[in-house]
Amino acid sequence: MTELELLGPRASGDALGTAVLKAVAEDFQVDEVLDIPLSGQGEHLWLWVEKRDLNTEEAARRLARAAGVPARSISYAGLKDRQALTRQWFSLHLPGKADPDLSRAEDETLRVLKQVRHQRKLQRGAHSANGFTLRLTGLQADHPALDARLEQLKQQGVPNYFGAQRFGHAGGNVHDALDWATRQALPEQRNVRSRLLSAARSYLFNQVLAARVADGSWQHAQVGDLLAFTDSRSFFAAGEAECSDPRLAILDLHPTGPLWGEGPAPGGGTPQALETEVGARHPQLCQWLARAGMDHERRILRLPIGRLTWHYPEPDILQLEFVLPAGCFATVVVRELVDLVPAGQTDSPCVF
């Protein structure tokens, strides 16, 4: 499957050129934003960890092993990219135990930067946002055109697609999900089951969003839409009055799309008709998600880009800094700017 099939059309026009992303880990930096005051006491040890070219699950296993606790005793808020330099929180459950020596977990790929005690463990999804510093190298694009496009993105946001990495190489996760859905069976391995269910839901959401990008309605509320605020999981139906809510214009309130699960798609009008049509094209996936016990949830169609700044450390390098809500993909921002080409090493440092 191609990227266009997995995501959908761009909203801002054709790519303005080409660039390389992730030539080195420092080109893709992620800092988890967690708005939780830590007390300094309790049976949970929270760890602020820097990872380089290491996925979150492997980092968790190494930290648990070094602490001498089972893997179920370590928690994290969210998964971060492997091919990146990332900083995120973990928590270890250590009732009645002293702080362990975690140096055995550390090497050039993992460093523990801070340790703080707290009364509660870190819950999945507890982070409010992620801060990104991206360096696009080998840039071949007109700077004034990029500047104008970035100003446009700052004002209108981007389609909140699930990024291509959610679907595996060439959409392999979607193909695997379709295979299981055809048999209406679930993988026994929990991590495989979670990955494929997530890929299926993400693919269906992207199909709905792609249709609304194509007809221009992705950033406009329609009667029957279910609206949600940027940082809220609750939603409400849009009537005529809600469609002109001024908070839509300032990127605070957004139309949403479906994260498929049990029960009919809520909402009404044209939006519901579209979602029903997408579901009818993929009945086995929808039935599979419902039978797996997934609840029907919503995700905003429009992604506001917080604190967006950019500069050019060199003529062929564009550095971007911005903040996105948890669960959103930095690569869909880049996609509205340039086409990415395969990585090749660069020697230029990342300037902050």
Swiss-Prot record:
Q: What disulfide bonds does the UniProt entry report for this chain?
A: none
Q: Does the keyword tRNA processing apply?
A: yes
> What's one GO-annotated cellular component?
cytosol
- Active-site feature positions: D81
- Say what the protein does: Responsible for synthesis of pseudouridine from uracil-13 in transfer RNAs.
- Broadest EC class assigned to this enzyme: isomerase
Look up the EC number in the record and give it: 5.4.99.27
List keywords of the entry alphabetically. Isomerase, tRNA processing
Translocase found in the keyword field: no
The Gene Ontology biological process terms listed for this entry are:
tRNA pseudouridine synthesis
The protein's matches in InterPro entries, at most eight in alphabetical order, are given as: PsdUridine_synth_cat_dom_sf (IPR020103), PsdUridine_synth_TruD (IPR001656), PsdUridine_synth_TruD_CS (IPR020119), PsdUridine_synth_TruD_insert (IPR011760), TruD_catalytic (IPR042214), TruD_insert_sf (IPR043165), TruD_pseudoU_synthase (IPR050170)
Protein name, as recorded: tRNA pseudouridine synthase D
Domain TRUD, first and last residues per copy: 157-303
Spell out the molecular function terms from Gene Ontology.
Answer: RNA binding; tRNA pseudouridine(13) synthase activity
From the UniProt record, list the reaction(s) this protein catalyses: uridine(13) in tRNA = pseudouridine(13) in tRNA
The entry sums up its family as follows: Belongs to the pseudouridine synthase TruD family.
